[in-house]
Amino acid sequence: MTMDHFSEYKAIQNKINAALETYFTADCPQKELLDAMRYSLLAGGKRIRPLLLVKFCEISGGDRAAALPAACGIEMLHTYSLIHDDLPCMDNDDLRRGKPTCHKMFGETNAVLAGDALQSAAYCAVLSAPTASERTAAMAKTLAFAAAEQGMCGGQYLDTSKEGLPVDRKSVV
C-alpha cells in the first residue's frame, strides 16, 4: 500500500467513523441498550467492509457520501455478529479489540438485545441510502442473505455444532 493509498484509506475510515458516531445518540428509556450498541459499534476496528463498499461505489461512478449509510449498515451487521459470537453460548470471549466484550460490560441480555438491534438498524441504514429504489432493495437483500442461514448464521452454526470435529472443505464452502 503506497502512502497515497494509506492516506485515502485513513480519510475514508475517518468519514465512516464520523458517520457511525451519528447513530444511537437519543436520550431515551433504552439508554443502556444504546450505550451497549455504541460501545461495540465504536470500539474501533479497521472498517474494511464499509471501506470496500465506499470504494466499489466510487469505482462504479457513485458518490462517496451517498454510500455512507450503506457502509454504516454493513458495519452494524458486522458488529452484531461479533457481539453474538462473543456470547457465553457461542465462543465465550471476554475481550474484543483489546476491550471487555459487550456481554462483560452490559450483561448477556443487553448484549443479545444490542446485537439484535444493530442487525435491524443495519437494514434501516441501508434502506436510508439516497439511491434508486431497485439498488436499495438489492443492497438490503444482499445484506439479509449475508446474515441468514447461508451466511453468518450458517457459519456460526457450523462453528458451534462442529466444534472439535473434523470439518471438510465441501461443508464449509
Language-model-derived ranges and their functions:
Residues T2-F24:
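N-terminal amphipathic/basic leader segments beginning at the initiator methionine
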